[in-house]
Swiss-Prot record:
A cellular-component GO term for this protein: cytoplasm
Name of the protein: Histidine ammonia-lyase
InterPro entries according to UniProt: Aromatic_Lyase, Fumarase/histidase_N, HutH, L-Aspartase-like, Phe/His_NH3-lyase_AS
Class in the EC hierarchy, top level: lyase
Gene encoding the protein: hutH
Native source organism of the sequence: Cereibacter sphaeroides (strain ATCC 17023 / DSM 158 / JCM 6121 / CCUG 31486 / LMG 2827 / NBRC 12203 / NCIMB 8253 / ATH 2.4.1.)
PTM note: Contains an active site 4-methylidene-imidazol-5-one (MIO), which is formed autocatalytically by cyclization and dehydration of residues Ala-Ser-Gly.
Keyword terms, alphabetized: Cytoplasm, Histidine metabolism, Lyase
Modified residues (2,3-didehydroalanine (Ser)): S142
């Protein structure tokens, strides 16, 4: 169970909720602020002064006053009308993370919802009630309206949810878990759908996967370096200290540790006529390290956003209810674009290492396409082509999304972040990257084995053994698609990196 303190939740907690399915609830000390804000909203709802979202319409209809008797229907109508999502459902793990993020936002005590709303969200997480949320339809301002409306619909007994492996109508799903729908009070519907939690959940998932891919890239690229008998001189700490970038320094140190003790490296330390390796070998710390730095910058933004109150209007500490724009997901959009760039570049340089290893003119005496009998066998020829295709896909998907604003809601919401699909694309990019890195691992393993009787280092030997437990040596042509998929799984699960038995830089 993760106890979430609003404003202080950590990335480690959020990753545990997303990756391990941990349950989560707010710390009890959040309740007084939540209830105080709810009391202030109830007071405003009973008054005559117009307060956006409490006794007015929404968006372009904000100038229309709503009678006190209609405020409950107003909130229900808001949820129903905004359930306009389309496309494939959000992955359940990411949907659960989204709910946890909504709890954190409500827990700041600035949204004005009753504690009953918090308790129902906590109950849904605890009982495994996961709303079915179509993944397309948000422009990332005014919040992730459509997807969050599908979440809120389940809370009022509408929509659909998964529970116990079954997809049920919202009311039935709640009943299955021993929960009851809630009747929304003033502003509660708006508080549930205003916010960036959908975009942020997807961006965090991309971040967590991206960091794991970066760790795998360090291990696999070290194995590739040994496969082509690359030099470790570019990993010397003095080089990286002279530049000073933290990620670069850490990447070089990790690769030095991975290659320490390699007999392959020692065999050509003296007398090698090659003066410099190609950039995809020589500049690995500069590229992967830079990607690590970018991922960390995105992590800082997303950690802040995860703990933010992104509702509108907000109940301030002095009791005033003020309209603002915290629902605008521009920070999340920028973070997602940064993650996309990092994923693309990790894959781009990895693909060049694959191309290097299969090319006999560049691989320092490895056989063409890493097969013992080239000609009769094509070896990894088309596996390299697959990595080129996926690399190109990722390059196209790395184009920024935040620059593509368009006016919505009759020009009331005239600049939007597009953070939702900017974050959502990261899942596809990670899938592609895992295949690129997994294929590189297969190529590097073949290359290292061709250097026998010389052996690689102990850490990389353990990595090679872990790979071979899933992907046998390719001695003759066979259908390689299952092997590529198996290697990609080892990348995504972290099994390949863990096999090295060394500490890795932390996010």
């Amino acid at each position: 169970m993760e106890i979430l303190v609003p404003g202080q939740a950590t990335l480690a907690q959020l990753e545990a909720i997303w990756r391990e399915g941990r349950r989560a609830r707010l710390a009890p000390e959040a309740r007084p602020a939540v209830e105080a804000a709810a009391a202030r909203v109830a007071e405003a709802a009973a008054g005559t002064a117009p307060v956006y979202g409490v006794n007015t319409g929404f968006g372009k209809l904000a100038s229309l006053k709503i009678a006190p008797a209609d405020t409950a229907q107003l909130q229900r109508n808001l949820i129903l009308s905004h359930c306009c999502g389309v496309g494939e459902p959000m992955p359940p793990s990411t949907a659960r993370l989204m709910i946890a993020l909504k709890l954190l936002s409500l827990g700041r005590g600035a949204s004005g919802v009753r504690w009953e709303i918090v308790a129902l969200l906590e109950g849904m997480l605890a009982a495994g009630v996961t709303p079915v949320i179509p993944a397309q339809g948000s422009v990332g301002a005014s919040g992730d309206l459509a997807p969050l409306a599908h979440m809120a619909a389940v809370m009022i007994g509408e929509g659909e949810a998964e529970v116990g492996g079954r997809r049920l109508p919202g009311a039935a799903a709640l009943a299955e878990a021993g929960l009851a729908p809630v009747a929304l009070g003033p502003k509660e519907g708006l508080a549930l759908i205003n916010g960036t939690q959908f975009s942020t959940a997807y961006a965090l998932a991309g971040l967590f996967e991206g960091w794991r891919a970066a760790q795998a890239a360090l291990v696999i690229s070290a194995l590739s370096t040994d496969a082509i008998m690359g030099s470790t001189a570019p990993l010397r700490p003095e080089i990286h200290a002279l530049r000073g970038h933290a990620g670069q320094i850490e990447a070089a140190a990790t690769m030095r540790a991975l290659l320490e003790g390699s007999a392959i490296r020692e065999s050509h330390r003296e007398g090698d006529q090659r003066v410099q390796d190609p950039y995809c070998i020589r500049c690995q710390p500069q590229v992967t390290g830079a990607a690590m730095d970018v991922l960390r910058m995105a992590a800082g933004t997303l950690a802040t956003e995860a703990n933010a109150a992104t509702d509108n209007p907000l109940v301030l500490s002095d009791g005033r209810i003020v309209s603002g724009g915290n629902f605008h997901a521009e920070p999340v959009g920028f973070a997602a674009d940064m993650i996309a760039l990092a994923l693309s570049e990790i894959g781009a340089i990895a693909q060049r290492r694959v191309a290097l290893m299969v090319d006999p003119t560049l691989s320092f005496d490895l056989p063409p396409f890493l097969t013992p009998e080239p000609g009769l066998n094509s070896g990894l020829m088309i596996a390299e082509v697959t990595t080129a295709a996926l690399m190109s896909e990722n390059k196209h998907m790395a184009a920024p999304t935040v620059t593509d604003s368009t006016p919505t809601s009759a020009n009331q919401e005239d600049h939007v972040s597009m953070a939702a699909h900017g974050a959502r694309r990261l899942g596809r990019m990670v899938e592609n990257l895992a295949v690129i890195l997994g294929t590189e691992a297969i190529c590097a393993a073949q290359g290292v084995e061709f250097r026998a009787p010389l052996a690689t280092s102990a850490p990389l030997g353990a990595v090679l053994a872990r790979l071979r437990a899933e992907v046998p040596r390719i001695a003759a042509d066979r259908i390689l698609a299952p092997d590529l998929a198996a290697a990609a799984r080892l990348v995504r699960t972290g099994a390949l990196a863990r096999a090295a038995g060394l500490p890795f830089p932390a996010l």
